[in-house]
Amino acid sequence: MKSSVEQLNPTRVRINVEVPFTELEPDFQRAYKELARHVQLPGFRPGKVPARLLEARFGRETLLDQVVNEAMPSRYGQALAESEVQPIGQPEIEVIRKEYGQDLAFTVEVEVRPKIALPDFSTLKVVVDPVEVSTDDVEAELRSLRARFGTLIGVDRPVALGDFVSIDLSATINGEKVPNADAEGLSHEVGYGRLIAGLDDALVGLSAGESRVFTTQLATSKHAGQDAEVIVTVKSVKERELPEPDDEFAQLVSEFDTMAELRANLGDQVRKAKYAQQAEKIRDAAVDALLERVDVPLPEGIVQAQFNNALHDALSGLGHDEAKFAEVLAERGSSREEFEAEARSAAERDVTRQLLLDVVADDQKIQVGQDDLNERLLATSQQYGVDAQQLFGFLRENNRLSSLVTDARRRLAVAAVVEAATFTDSDGNTIDTSEFFGKHAQSDKADQKTEEADPNSDAIDEEVDEAAE
């Protein structure tokens, strides 16, 4: 077999392949044997029908098509291996010559990972915001802790923000009741508009036994996107009484004896959380700084596929109703043109970062280990609020374990850039990134999290190893 590669543009190649007919003869023999096993002709035992009779009955062209269609994928794979081309899209195959007794010729056009010239990461200088813990930050954390131990007491006054209410709800559209929209005795914390848009505004000022009608746009069911008249009735009003922030409270909720010790500990927790937030900003800033120094050609097919996915996801929640989609966009003060422009821009940004990090991972010869995958599995499960084993099962059943490997590899690529670059805050202080991005920090955190959550059995470890390979 002979193959050659033409570079059509920085992200697309054409592979020309020629396969001598003699190389296809074993494929023909297998095709004849397989066909003969399923054909019954008078005078011949199963599997013993001569090739010439099979050709006469089914046509040589039919057999040729079958052999060629089965042969091209493996020959394409062989051509990729020989040329070291790294495809990132679906191949487009065109048969140039296909005649019995003659060499097979076909071409494959496919999008490939572009070549990117990387700078010396140690020359990157990045500035981010400093970590600052204020008294207000600590007080907010303390209020949250006090709220967890608060007591709900009934009050005889109108509803205010922060109250807990028991309510009844019903909805109508054009005077007709919306099926399955009624609710009785529903508990709701006013000011945390998680139920229905406009509900909190309607509740404030009502007393127990009073009702109010307001208009809102339904977000689910077959009526999604339609305006509905909602009636809310307040059944009861309660407020949360917070415990006093004294030494007794500190002893109740922690291992500390005094409020001063508890406040100091809360300050440490806030500081750690802010350092973690700063680490994410450092991660993004490192990639942005690198992007300013490199040129990343974009494969249009990959960008288009990501754009199509975004559009599909937006429409699927509305039953692919274009009119409803237009209404929802109009309510947000947007339009289809603006949505598509933003979606394409996001797709281009995501693909650019993905391609860059893949090249960095190759350049740094990054290998993904089991601990890295365990960490990503646990972090992703926490992000979506699901059990790690359930997430693993979902990824395995949907053949998406490789996406976990890719994600882990790209994060390690960012860590390599961060470790080499210099980071300072806007006050001029050098930032030590080793806690979150050092070589040992990655595996140490993975070991710790794995021990805490234990999401992996031996069977899971084996499959994770296979995915990494």
UniProtKB/Swiss-Prot annotation:
Annotated GO MF terms: peptidyl-prolyl cis-trans isomerase activity; protein folding chaperone; ribosome binding
Region of interest (Disordered), ranges: 429-469
Compartments where located: Cytoplasm
UniProt feature coiled coil, ranges: none
Extent of Basic and acidic residues compositional bias: 437-452
Domain of life, source organism: Bacteria
GO biological-process terms attached to the record: 'de novo' cotranslational protein folding; cell division; chaperone-mediated protein folding; protein transport; protein unfolding
Known EC number: 5.2.1.8
Family recorded in the similarity comment: Belongs to the FKBP-type PPIase family. Tig subfamily.
Domain commentary: Consists of 3 domains; the N-terminus binds the ribosome, the middle domain has PPIase activity, while the C-terminus has intrinsic chaperone activity on its own.
PANTHER family linked to this entry: TRIGGER FACTOR CHAPERONE AND PEPTIDYL-PROLYL CIS/TRANS ISOMERASE, TRIGGER FACTOR-LIKE PROTEIN TIG, CHLOROPLASTIC
Its biological purpose: Involved in protein export. Acts as a chaperone by maintaining the newly synthesized protein in an open conformation. Functions as a peptidyl-prolyl cis-trans isomerase.
Record-given protein name: Trigger factor
Origin species: Mycobacterium leprae (strain TN)
Source taxonomy: Bacteria, Bacillati, Actinomycetota, Actinomycetes, Mycobacteriales
Gene: tig
